[in-house]
A protein has these predicted regions:
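PLP-dependent amino-acid enzyme catalytic core
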Residues: 1-405
Length: 405
């Protein structure tokens, strides 16, 4: 097991490579939660995530013979870029195996760091297996994204930076996927301050660490279902499971809806754009029961494409009650659209879109459906709109965020 000086040496090893991301105090989340909240913005790290820390630390510690062989990794995201940049900095050949359908922007970003990219397999597991085959055939050193002590050591340097800036921090919230990030942070933080609490944050649809703890050993989930794709891991690392058992105080799960809302708040209040997995630790702030504590949320990465940003903002607005989308059945006769528009105007609801198709219901003696999207001021405003429609004899059905394009 690592000692404190191991993490200190790792920080020195990384000093010329990484960006020391400064804590950002959040008056917004502090006021909302009753705690003193800080954000550690690893989305501003080189390559856009914390992964460069573990990747560089691992590769830098290889023997000269291992370095001559080159390194190989499998990844569809941040680990690929971390390994590629680390290898480039150290003058080592890097091969990255990515699934065939990895977004082109991620493929090109990895190539720009000088790595050879091979597209293989439909899913990550296929790419992983092919990378292992190439490792055996060509003699490369495989760089695992989380189940590796040197990778864990590199990720733990985040805790040293946090406690250097905020030595009296009470709680650190950490996104939890495979377990590499939380393993390093938990051990390094506890070595510096044994009473600090480390809380992992998993998506509800990929809670592999909680499943392992309940089972008493690592277990593979049958599937994952979450928008936080960076933490959509079916099985945590066996090495990481030991760290979690011994050094992590609690694990919280977050729904996709909670992620959408927190994503919007980060963009709107802090002008911070983060990937969905990175937002987990921010979404978890509301689930902390303690008050008056100094809490640090590790925002683990910011590699997110523009289309996803747009979708997350729209869905976040729906979850926050800033956009209200509903359907209402109208008698199929003239003047109904005018009546609906009049109600919305009286309630100061700004109409974004109306979708009306009188041919949808071929039985002319029945109602037709109107779908309405309006801008609102929150849940109280939505309730007033709903009540007014009800008074006028209309029945409306609220549509959820999954139905927003």
């Amino acid at each position: 097991m690592h000692k404190l000086y191991d993490f200190i040496e790792a920080r020195e090893r990384l000093s010329t490579v990484i960006t020391k991301t400064k804590l950002i105090h959040s008056s917004v989340f502090s006021k909302e939660t009753g705690n003193d909240v800080y954000i550690k913005p690893e989305n501003l790290q080189r390559t856009g995530s914390f992964k460069i820390r573990g990747a560089y630390n691992k590769i830098a510690k290889l023997t000269e013979e291992e370095k001559r062989k080159g390194v190989i990794a499998s990844s569809a995201g941040n680990h690929a870029q971390g390994v590629a940049l680390a290898a480039q900095k150290l003058g080592i050949k890097a091969v990255i195996v990515m699934p065939k359908y990895t977004p082109l922007i991620k493929v090109e970003a990895t190539r720009q760091y000088g790595a050879e990219v091979i597209l293989a397999g439909e899913e990550y597991d296929d790419a992983y297996n092919y990378a292992r085959e190439l490792q055996e055939k060509e003699g490369y050193v495989f760089i695992h994204p989380f189940n590796d002590d040197d990778v864990v050591e590199g990720q733990g340097t985040i805790a040293l930076e946090v406690l250097e800036e905020l030595p009296d921090a009470d709680i650190i919230l950490v996104p939890l996927g495979g377990g590499g990030l939380i393993s390093g942070i938990a051990l390094a933080a506890k070595l510096k301050n044994p009473v600090i609490k480390i809380i992992g944050v998993e998506p509800e649809g990929a809670a592999s660490a909680i499943a392992a703890l309940k089972n008493g050993d690592v277990v593979e989930l049958p599937e994952t279902n979450t928008i936080a794709d960076g933490t959509a891991v079916r099985k945590i690392g066996e090495l990481n499971f030991d760290y979690i058992k011994n050094y992590v105080d609690d694990i919280i799960t977050i729904s996709d809806y909670e992620l959408m809302e927190s994503f919007l708040l980060l963009v709107e209040k802090h002008k911070i754009v983060a990937e969905n997995a990175g937002v987990l630790s921010v979404a978890a702030l509301r689930k902390i029961k303690e008050k008056g504590k100094k809490i640090v949320s590790i925002l683990s990465g910011g590699n997110i494409d523009v289309l996803t940003i747009s979708s997350m903002i729209n869905k976040g607005l729906v979850v926050r009650g800033r956009i209200f989308r509903f359907s209402v059945d109208l008698p199929d006769k003239p003047g109904q659209l005018v009546a609906v528009s009049q109600i919305l105007s009286e309630q100061n609801a700004n109409v974004i879109r109306l979708e009306h198709n009188q041919f949808k219901n071929l039985n002319r003696f029945h109602d037709v459906e109107l779908q309405v999207t309006v801008e609102t001021n929150g849940e109280e405003h939505i309730n007033k709109i709903t009540e007014e429609f009800s008074k006028r004899g209309y029945v409306i059905k609220r549509l959820n965020s999954q139905e927003i394009e």
